[in-house]
């Protein structure tokens, strides 16, 4: 049981909190027989893997030129790859990997021809030739009126006379309120209130 107070919690020991766990003694065997571990070997596992692969790409349209070849015999891997850089030089990397030396690579750079010019992309679309028709302008004479369209009638304004009259005020007697003799009080655990 831990009691939390201000600061660091400290354990508080209580005889009630201690659990009594009964121990059951069983029969102990006199000798142990080891369980025979059965080892299963994956039928597709090859303890001495071997392979060889290579590829070569030479695309004159995009200028992509690279190649790679690699051979593996067990844990020993040897290979090389080359790529044509953007400046026309050729980078060749020869590498090997084994359990003793790890991975090692040697990089050579060979001067090459100038980089190929970028591929010319021709558009199949041609601009459409069009000719706009000439615009004809002509003056339209302004309309003239010989007589006015409407005849204005003069307006006369008259204000109505204003009459004021007083309305007598309504008066009434209000009864005087007398407080009732009722008193209400409340009692709560922390104080008393009375109204």
From Swiss-Prot:
Residues 38-78 are annotated as: Disordered. Residues 63-73 have a biased composition (Basic and acidic residues). PROSITE patterns: CHIT_BIND_RR_1, CHIT_BIND_RR_2. One of its GO terms (cellular component) is extracellular matrix. InterPro entries: CHIT_BIND_RR_consensus, Insect_cuticle, Insect_Cuticle_Struc_Prot. GO terms for molecular function: structural constituent of cuticle. Pfam families: Chitin_bind_4. The modification Pyrrolidone carboxylic acid is found at residue 1. Residues 48-118 form the Chitin-binding type R&R domain. Keywords: Cuticle, Pyrrolidone carboxylic acid. This is Cuticle protein 8.
């Amino acid at each position: 049981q831990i009691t939390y107070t201000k600061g660091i919690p400290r354990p508080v020991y209580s005889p009630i909190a201690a659990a009594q766990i009964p121990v059951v003694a069983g029969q102990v065997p006199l000798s142990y027989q080891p369980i025979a571990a059965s080892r299963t070997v994956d039928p597709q596992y090859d303890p001495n893997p071997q392979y060889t692969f290579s590829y070569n790409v030479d695309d004159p349209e995009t200028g992509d030129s690279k190649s790679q070849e690699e051979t593996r015999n067990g844990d020993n891997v040897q290979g090389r790859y080359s790529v044509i850089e953007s400046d026309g030089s050729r980078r060749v990397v020869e590498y090997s990997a084994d359990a003793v030396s790890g991975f090692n690579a040697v990089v050579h750079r060979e001067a090459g021809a100038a980089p190929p010019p970028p591929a010319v992309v021709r558009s199949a679309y041609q601009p459409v030739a069009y000719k706009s028709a000439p615009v004809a302008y002509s003056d339209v004479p302004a309309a003239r009126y010989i007589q006015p369209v409407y005849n204005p009638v003069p307006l006369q304004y008259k204000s109505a006379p204003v009459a004021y009259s007083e309305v007598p005020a309504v008066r009434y007697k209000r009864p005087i309120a007398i407080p009732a003799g009722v008193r209400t009080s409340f009692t709560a655990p922390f104080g008393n209130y009375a109204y």
